[in-house]
Amino acid sequence: MQEKKSGGYTKKILVVDDQRSQLKLMKKMLERIGYMAVTVDSAEEAEYILRGEESFSMVITDLKMPWLDGLNFCKKAKILDPNLKIFALSGFLYDFDMNELEDAGFDGIYEKPISKAQLAEILNVGIEKTRD
């Protein structure tokens, strides 16, 4: 569990999913364990945010979204910041080529729905990789 700094959270995570129910769930789970979650319902909006001055410890994104999917979002985000840790979530992993997902630069790929234990694993892997 993350300790909160005085007046705020220690880590800020961008969560991208076109399903608002998933965004609410992820935000609630992350905030309960001391992370700040910024949620957006499109990869285009997430890309716009990443181009700004706000920085994030990591990104957790859905793969199957309209217009810009998670795979192409990851490629664009890695161009903006090659060190940004990005984790994919999808209920439709069978629709994707795992090699292509790994080549895009994802730091982890998980099937929805994720458990609290899997979320903890994502956070631990992301934080450890951030420290490297």
Predicted regions and their residues:
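Acidic catalytic/metal-coordinating carboxylates
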Residues: 41-45, 69-73
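Active-site beta3 strand of CheY-like receiver
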Residues: 54-60
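Two-component/phosphorelay signaling modules centered on CheY-like receiver
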Residues: 20-38
